Structures are given as C-alpha cells and as structure tokens.
C-alpha cells in the first residue's frame, strides 16, 4: 500500500472471521470457464476454478454452507445494458453456457441460483439464504475479479457481512485488474488472503 493510502488511514487491520461462514461462488458457469466459449478462455479463471474446487471439498466436509450463482436471462429484453457481446449472445436460460462447471458443482449440497446483475446479492435469494443459515462471514470466490466479484464484495460489505477473499480463487482476463481490484478492496471492504490460509481455518471447524 502506498504512503498516501497509509497516511490517510486505509487498511487499519484484519476484519477476521465471525461465528458462522459460507462460501460464495460467483459465475463459475461454462460460459466463463469452458474454452469453447469466448469468455471461457482465461487461464487465470481456469486456475481459480481448480483452486475453488479444493476449497469447496474442505468446506463441504465441514458442513459449511455453499451458495453458487450463474448469470442468465429470458431474452435480451430483460438484460441490463451489458457491453460484453458473448454474454449478450449466449447467457440465455437453457443455453449450455449457463450450466455450472462440474468441478465446483454439487447439486445435492449447494444452494444454486440465477442472478441478473454483476453482484451475487442484487435481486437474488442469497440474502435470505444467508440469514436462515445464520451466516455473518462470507468467503467470496469466482469471476471476474474486476467485475462480478468486486461488485459482490462491495454488496457483502454493505449487508454488514465480514468478507474474506482467497486471491487464488478469483480470476480475471489480465493480472493487473485482478491485482489492483483485490488490493483496493483489501484497503476498504475485505480481508484478502490465501487459499491455504482459508483451508487451514476451515480445518479447525
């Protein structure tokens, strides 16, 4: 962190874990993770899927709630004004691009739902689910770091949740926006940590 941010009082310490946590997985659907689709050709995202699969295996073994989103629409008529052509063309209900990546999907365990905006919280059933589970801490994973993940971090913070982000479990098209957005969120809204650190914590539950 630069002296300007430090001198202004940013990043004053860790938020830490609360009493009950959940894992949130943002948009690891085939349209974002399978190379057959234009948005699915990002090596950093592929690695994030593999890392998140490791995290979820431990989380499920500890009975930690897991909530996953995918993005889809009925038609272009109910889409926001996206500037992402593959999303506009493919992310329609029933299209294969909206199916979740099998590496991270456990339909018998996870709470899975469709979202229609960048944030996993916006107009979705997630808040009610987390309330019913007694969750006060969320570990956010998914793609992309500078888009839907950042929007979800800010909304989680705005809902009064503790936010933890294992950096290896998120990905973007390029390293720079990934790094800059995580660093900035870490100054303000979230603890940015490592996959191993989160797994080590889960093992204590």
Regions found by a protein language model. Give the residues of each.
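A short glycine-rich beta-strand->turn/loop micro-motif centered on a GG-aromatic cluster
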Residues: 139-142, 162-175
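Active-site-proximal loop->helix
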Residues: 173-186
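Active-site acidic carboxylates
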Residues: 1-106, 202-205
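Internal catalytic-core helix/loop-beta-alpha segment
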Residues: 94-143
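Short glycine/serine/threonine-rich phosphate/pyrophosphate-binding segments
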Residues: 145-152
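Glycine-centered short loops/turns at secondary-structure junctions
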Residues: 61-64, 134, 160
């Amino acid at each position: 962190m630069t002296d300007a941010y430090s001198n202004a009082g940013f990043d004053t310490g860790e938020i830490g874990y609360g009493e009950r946590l959940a894992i949130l997985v943002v948009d690891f659907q085939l349209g974002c993770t399978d190379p057959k689709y234009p948005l699915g050709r990002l090596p950093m995202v592929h690695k994030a899927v593999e890392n998140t699969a490791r995290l979820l295996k431990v989380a499920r073994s500890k009975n930690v709630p897991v909530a996953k989103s995918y993005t889809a629409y009925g038609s272009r008529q109910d889409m926001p004004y996206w500037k992402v052509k593959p999303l506009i063309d493919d992310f329609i209900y029933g299209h294969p691009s909206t199916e979740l990546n099998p590496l991270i999907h456990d339909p018998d365990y996870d709470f899975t739902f469709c979202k229609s905006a960048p944030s996993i919280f916006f107009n979705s059933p997630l808040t009610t689910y987390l309330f019913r589970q007694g969750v006060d801490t969320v570990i956010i994973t998914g793609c992309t770091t500078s888009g839907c993940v950042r929007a979800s971090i800010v909304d989680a913070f705005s809902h009064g949740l503790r936010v933890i982000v294992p950096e290896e479990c998120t990905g973007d098209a390029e390293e720079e926006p990934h790094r800059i957005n995580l660093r900035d969120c870490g100054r303000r809204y979230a603890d940015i940590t490592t996959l191993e650190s989160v797994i080590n914590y889960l093992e204590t539950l």
